[in-house]
Amino acid sequence: MSQTHPFKPIFDKNSKISILGSFPSVVSRKFGFYYANPQNRFWRVLAGILNTPLSESIDEKIKFLLAHRIAIYDAAISCEIKGSSDAKMTAVEPANLEPIFSGARVVQVFANGGKAHEICEKYLKNQILNATGKEAAKLPSTSPANANFSLERLVQEWMVVADTLRDG
């Protein structure tokens, strides 16, 4: 079934990095915000790498992201998808990242998982390179489907985000 991305990107003029997922899950679409599935470890990973308490409400999560200069969005603005599985995504239409790049000083884009990185490489590479001078960096997915990675291992792999935020 064809789905259109229901959320706006989260960023402000101070955003230094952008984290792109692939496309919102069924649970996220139902609850109206990024990474709303409690099994997804995105928010726990960010809290872990930044040594902060876990944000609970949507407002707290937005404030957390902006306070830490993190922009979030997804690489696809629409796609055909059954359920939440990235493996079942087809007919991908890439997101337009220009509003983020023109409204913030993003120095690095991070792709949350293989599908997000694949979309970045296939459709968004030039836009990302032109804006940041670097290709999107692939991070292991925080999705519960990525059972090969424990929370501790994800935090370790995602420390590059905290390092990028600290530098400069």
Which residue stretches match the model-derived regions?
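Internal catalytic-core helix/loop-beta-alpha segment
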Residues: A67-E118
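Short, glycine/serine-rich, charged loops/turns that create anion-binding
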Residues: P24-V27, I77, A116, S143
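C-terminal capping/extension of enzyme domains
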Residues: M1-K16, N37-P38, G83-E98, E121-G168
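Pocket-edge structural micro-motifs
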Residues: S22, D74, P140
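Short, surface-exposed acidic-centric catalytic microdomains
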Residues: V27-K88
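Residue-level signal for well-ordered alpha-helical scaffold segments within enzymatic catalytic domains
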Residues: R44-G48, P99, K122
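Short, hydrophobic/glycine-enriched beta-strand segments
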Residues: K16-S22
